[in-house]
């Protein structure tokens, strides 16, 4: 029995090492593979069961030196890789967000009809849309028709056509009617008042003249015919895809360059150490 006790004790020999108390617990806890036995002034003694090795005592200086080497070797590489992945995710999100906000996708756009043929909107809206799309044609047509309208009203007032009763019938304010009656330049003011009252008719004539002019210019090859809506949408979609792919390729190239620079720096540090 006395011989068996030392023999069993030798088989259950324990390996320990000493670690400085001042080191942080979470940084060095992974090196301790057994429960804590002794906790005194400057050292903590931990033990782990081992079958062959006996008690092993390491100085606190050696433990700290090994720990610092491991921390210097591993964390920079892991940190840089995580940082580069984080930057890659942020840049990809920015590219997608900028491409989605700067350009509207053609699928989301409503199919816009020709404002000259669209009867579902008001006269003023048709005039505005026609001005945006056919401004070069609408402006000269509108100036010519407006000149004709004003000239007609002015000629009528000069020839003695009294339009004052007509203005009173349509409900023009009395102050304006009195100004037109008593002013020395009554003919011009009267013509201008009639010109403003006839605004809906003037806009209708302008839109009709613009439509006729556009058809004439297209038939003679002076204006290009707009493409069909489907072809236009397909072209816009292809352009948007090309822009997005170009931006993604640029960001990938930048990220690969940064990763290569980071790897080179990490390898250089390892060689120096």
Swiss-Prot record:
High-level lineage: Eukaryota, Metazoa, Chordata, Craniata, Vertebrata
Self-association and partners: Interacts with ATAD3A.
Keywords, alphabetical: Coiled coil, Cytoplasm, Membrane, Mitochondrion, Transmembrane, Transmembrane helix
Organism from which the protein derives: Mus musculus (Mouse)
Family recorded in the similarity comment: Belongs to the FAM210 family.
Protein name according to UniProt: Protein FAM210A
InterPro entries, per database record: FAM210A/B-like, FAM210A/B-like_dom
Bilayer topology term: Single-pass membrane protein
Known tissue expression: Expressed in skeletal muscle, heart, brain but not in bone.
Any one cellular-component term (Gene Ontology): mitochondrion
